[in-house]
Swiss-Prot record:
Keyword Repeat: yes
Keyword terms, alphabetized: ANK repeat, Repeat
Protein name per Swiss-Prot or TrEMBL: Putative ankyrin repeat protein RF_0266
Coiled coil location: none
Entry keyword Coiled coil: no
Pfam families in alphabetical order: Ank_2 (PF12796)
Organism: Rickettsia felis (strain ATCC VR-1525 / URRWXCal2)
PROSITE patterns tied to this protein: ANK_REP_REGION
Swiss-Prot/TrEMBL ANK repeat ranges: 68-98, 103-129, 130-161, 163-189, 203-232
Gene3D superfamilies on file: Ankyrin repeat-containing domain (1.25.40.20)
InterPro entries: Ankyrin_rpt, Ankyrin_rpt-contain_sf, Multifunctional_ANK_Repeat
Amino acid sequence: MPKKFTTRKGDIYTIDTPNEENLFKSVINKNTSEAFRYISQFNFPLSDNIKTIRYFAIDEDKPNNVGTSHSTLSLIAVINNDLETLNLLINFGFDINNHSGINYITPLGLAADKGYKEIVKLLCEQDDIKVQNALYYAIRGENKSIEIIDLLVQKGAIIKPEHIELAISHSNLSVFEYLFEKKLPDIEKNNLKLIGSSPAISSIDCILGEASKYQNTEVIKFLLSSGYKPEQKYIDEFFVSAADNGRLKTCITLKANIEEHTRLEGLSKYQNYLKDKYHDYYKTHIIFLSKFSYTDEPVEMFMFDNESNLLLLSMSRPLRSKLSSKDSYIIHDAIKEIFNNTHLNIKELELARFKARIEFIKITTDEDLVPLSNKLAPLFSPELIHDLSKLEEELFPEVKLAGLAD
């Protein structure tokens, strides 16, 4: 019966022999000299059972799931970012390629995900290293590194269409540009077909569709300014689709490349989206949504009639310049919070936004501050400002048109 061993982090592993337990402890505690001593106690040459030894985590609350999470010694060394111990294990022939754990990740994959460049270099120097699995983690990882991705590609990792999509969905322009350049021959020949793409659509149009879906505005701008600009009909199609699904950042980025009739079609789609999305609040709440302007001029892409009771504020540079810098950041952050957390109660988010603003005003003495409705008055219609003023008074009676009460 294997012995149970609990680490300092609370993880429980099964250990077969005392020497295996000691080796495991030395590796997990980053003690290379002790690891060397315990490895030396095995019979040489090391058997495959020793080289590929795995330590299985136990979930005591779910005993039937024993063995679903497991780690090789090499993976443990990578988890610790322990280059010295990993090098020792490699020199003794311990496995560096086996997938470990429920995430099906290799030591190289984990190192690529974490951005451990020196460990990636060491592993890539090994003749028998398998690199394909690691490319996925390098692209989507916590610390994306072009250097690591290039090491893997130079070692033989094949860039596939799904890697392009992964770079788009994880919003990293530099990684996308690297992969785009590497796959340019396929893109030019329309051989790069993303998952679910139609054979009738070119590679560049497929990429724009993915960027539009994930609202990756940097990639969209890159494509529109490149020598491989997508067809106009697809630019229009993706604009309307984005409006239909409430993807404002995509709409803003594509707006300069569409005709007025397409914009109006998008407006209709977007109004219907808001009615469906905010049905419970449509008649009773004002919803603030950021339009993320990317130009020096206010973006008036979508406007609503007064009956809709929906207020769409454009957080463009001119608007921000008319507000105090700190105040505008509070507003902008709150707007993004609402935009990204639409499953939450809109009323509660509005309360939080005004509370944040009031707390800011209370501790600020270096400028003349007035209620938000007053600051916005020069920029919007009287009817719109009236609605905003009413909301301020409803939520916080201490907010008056002349300023905050003491």
